[in-house]
Structures are given as structure tokens and as C-alpha cells.
């Protein structure tokens, strides 16, 4: 049994480690959380490499605690206050962090495989290099968090607040991002394979040159986003909002834009082969002759053979046609 903690009058400290209680890997073989909590109350903050597997720390206040490289596998941390905590390199597989307060905490390179962070508060938290495959982050607030190079394969981020978060080189393969807010997030070099982005909020994002091939993006909000040279081939964007988006040079081969809103979008140099555009709002959109060269399914329904209003502009000939589409022939 762990010896009782002695609190000296002049200095409070965690008891010296008895190596007989530790494995050859330096991890505690037994851990009673009561001495830990008492030590925390007396100002001790460093508890690195402890064994807290399956420990119940739910609801406790552990602000700025140092659990670096601690074993927290299967631990209960529901509603625990871990603001500014040091949890780097921790083993947290299957841990329950539902509604935990993790704002500005360091979870870099932590293993959170299959962990639950449902509704957790992790604003400006550092998850760099963390493993979050199969984790639940639905309704979590990760605004401004750093998730660079994180493994989010198969993770559930339904309706999560990911605004302004850094996902550079993150892996979202098979992840659920339905209704998630990604506005102003950094997805540079992120992997989005079979990612579900239906009804996701992606306003004013830089998605240029990304591969968004074959994704479910129905109802996504992409207002004002940059999709220059982006590969959207064979993706479904039915009912998506692309108002004012820049799709210059984007690959829309086989894309389904049924009922999408492209008002004011820049569609120059787009590859349209076999794109489906039934019921699209083209008002004030800018396009070029590729709209007429390639096989676009549904575009003909908006075309009539009446004379068009043609005038010479600074960028070339602007032709008002297809129910509001303005095709700019750059010359």
C-alpha cells in the first residue's frame, strides 16, 4: 500500500518513489487516488508516469496538473477540470473525458484511441501528433486547437466546433464531420478520404489544391471559400452553399451539384465533365467557355435560344444566360 503523504511545514512534496512498487518500465504498479488528491490540495502538481488505469477522477479540479506519460487507460475523467494540464504522451485509450475541461491543455502525442471527448471543452488545446482514431468528439469545442499531424481516422466529430483549428497534415479518413464547424480552420495537406462533410460549416476556408474526391458534402456551407484547383471529382454537393466561392480551375468531374447555390461564384477554368447541375442557382456567377464545351447534365434545362445581352467588359465578353449565369469569355 502506498505510504501516507507527509506534508512538511516548510515544503510540500510528493513522497519519494519506492522503486519496488514500479515495473521495469518505470510505471507505478498501484495507485491510490486519495493521496494524489490530497497532495494536489497541498500544492503538488507533478505526478508523471503514474498508473491511473481505470481510475475515477470524474468531477475533480486538477488545473495545471502534470500527468506527463501517465497511464490513464480507461480512466473516468467526466467533467474533470484539466485546464492547462500536461498530458503529453499519456496513454488514454478508452478514457472517458465527456464534458471535461481541457482548455489550453497539452495532449501532444497522447494516445486517445477510442476515447470519449463528447462535449469536451478543448479551446486552444494542443493535440499535435495525438492518436484520436475512433474517438468520439461530437459536440466538443476545439476552437483554435492544434491538431497538426493527428490521427482522426474513423473519429466522430459530429457538430463539433473546430473553428480556427489547425489540422495541417491530419488524417480524417472515414471520419464523421457532419454539421461540424470548420470555418477558418487550416486543412493544408490534410487527408480527407471517405470523410463525411454533410452540412458542415466551411465558410471562408482555404481549400485550394486539396483532394476532396468522392466525398459526401451535401448541404455543406462553403460561402466565400477558396477552392482553386481543388479536386471535387465525383463528390456530392447537393444543396451546398457555394455563394461567392472561388472555384477557379477546380475539378468538378462527375460532381453532383443538384440544387446548389453558386451565386457570385468564380467558375473559370473549371473541369465540368459529366457534372450534374439540376436546379443550380447561377445568379451573378462567373464562368468561361468550358461551361459550353463539356457535358454538363442539367445545364440545358436553363438555356433558351433568345438573344443574350452582350457587352464588352474589362475581362472580355459577358453573356447573361442560363437564368442569371454570367459567362465571362476571357480574351
Swiss-Prot record:
It comes from the Bacteria. The keyword Cell cycle does not apply. Keywords: Repeat. Residues 50-89, 90-129, 140-179, 185-224, 230-269 form the Pentapeptide repeat domain. Pfam families: Pentapeptide (PF00805). InterPro entries: 5peptide_repeat. PANTHER family: THYLAKOID LUMENAL 17.4 KDA PROTEIN, CHLOROPLASTIC. This is Uncharacterized protein slr1152. It comes from Synechocystis sp. (strain ATCC 27184 / PCC 6803 / Kazusa).
